[in-house]
Every structure is written in C-alpha cells, then in structure tokens.
Regions:
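Conserved beta-alpha junction segments in alpha/beta enzyme cores
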Residues: 1-97, 101-212
C-alpha cells in the first residue's frame, strides 16, 4: 500500500479576525491617474488577521503575525502598531505584513492634506487600539493544534521588470525571460478534536492588481 508522507507541526495557536474597514470617505488616491482623492463608498470590508504561535510547554515567547488588508504602511506607522501590541508583554515577537491590495486607501502621512486625508490619523489610531485588543483576545485563546502543510506551485507569478533593449532601460512590463519564485505553501490548522481552525496560504508571489 502506498504511503504519502504528510508534513506536520505541533504548537499552540490562536486566530482572531478583526474588521478594519476605514470610513467610506477616507483618502483613496492610490493611483496617479485617479480622478478623485476621497473614496465614495465601500465595496467590501477589509480585515486584520491576528495569528499567534507559541511553543508547546514554553510560554517564554509568542510570535504574533498581524496580517493587514492594506497596500502598505510607512515604516513608522508599522512601528507604532508593534509598540502598541508590545505593551501587552515583553515576550512577544511581532511581524506586520500586508495583502498589498490597492483597494483599501492610501494611509501615508503626506496624504493628510488631501480630501479625506484628515481621517487617516484617527483611523490608524483606532486600528492600533483594536489590533492590541484583538491580540489580547488571541493570547487568551491559545490552544494545542496540529498544522499539516505541503509545498506546491503557483503559476500566476510573472516577472514585470522588462529590459527595453532599444531604449536600454527597464520598464514595468511582462518579462518572459525570467522565471519567478512560484513556490506555494499551504497549511491546515486543526485543534485536538480535528476541527479545522483556519487554512494558511503563503508566498503566492504575484503582485495583485485590479483590471483598470
């Protein structure tokens, strides 16, 4: 009988999802060709996912992954999130990452002078507070889990640094000569009763853009 080896890890884990949808009229001029600065409505809500990992039988350090549905934040804005969460405990190792959606507003500090920009700082402050509370909740919900994972391949990624040889310069365009990293890692997190808590997908390495 054939046997398939499955990669697994045992750890403590918790997952909390937090709604971080900004005000519908916040600054949104992410694209240079945008015809307006402030958003005019909300198509879908956006979220922050708080993932907590802790070694079995060792509470000396917890790894906190904060996954934000935003394109990016300034480094100082990321540090303020980390500092806020770090106030919970000195035993936290915190990582902030982004889905890189281009549809969630642009929260850079130099945007506050534009229409809708006055809502950026209050939104970020509220988001930091809510992330801290969600992290506390996740830490209180830590439980023993099994993470089953496997590597695969995702062919969506392409290289977009194309060398225009006529002009002797790089342009933003499809480059068929370079094969990007297409490694895909997927995981399933299950509790002691084999109930699935969440699924994890990592390194789907393509730049997510809407069709415009």
């Amino acid at each position: 009988m054939d046997k398939v080896e499955t990669q697994t890890s045992r750890t403590q884990f918790a997952f909390v999802r937090l709604d971080i949808t900004p005000p519908e009229d916040i600054y949104h001029g992410l694209w240079g060709a945008a015809a307006q600065h402030a958003a005019t409505g909300i198509h879908k809500n956006i979220f922050a996912d708080i993932l907590v990992f802790q070694k079995l039988g060792d509470s000396s350090q917890s790894v906190i992954m904060i996954l934000l549905d935003h394109v990016m934040f300034e480094e100082s804005q990321q540090e303020m999130i980390k500092e806020k969460v770090q106030n919970i405990s000195d035993n936290l190792k915190i990582l902030v990452t982004f889905s890189h959606t281009h549809s969630a507003g642009f929260m850079y500090s130099d945007r506050v002078k534009f229409p809708g920009g006055e809502k950026i700082n209050p939104y970020l402050e509220l988001t930091r507070d809510n992330i801290k509370e969600a992290t506390k909740k996740a830490l209180d919900q830590l439980e023993d889990v099994t993470i089953t994972f496997e590597y695969g391949q995702c062919g969506l990624a392409t290289n977009r640094d194309y060398k225009d040889r006529k002009r002797d310069q790089f342009v933003c365009g499809f480059n068929p000569e370079v094969i990007p990293d297409q490694t895909l890692l997927v995981g399933r997190v299950s509790d002691a009763n084999d109930r699935i808590l969440c699924n994890l997908v990592h390194n789907c390495s393509f730049h997510k853009l809407p069709l415009v």
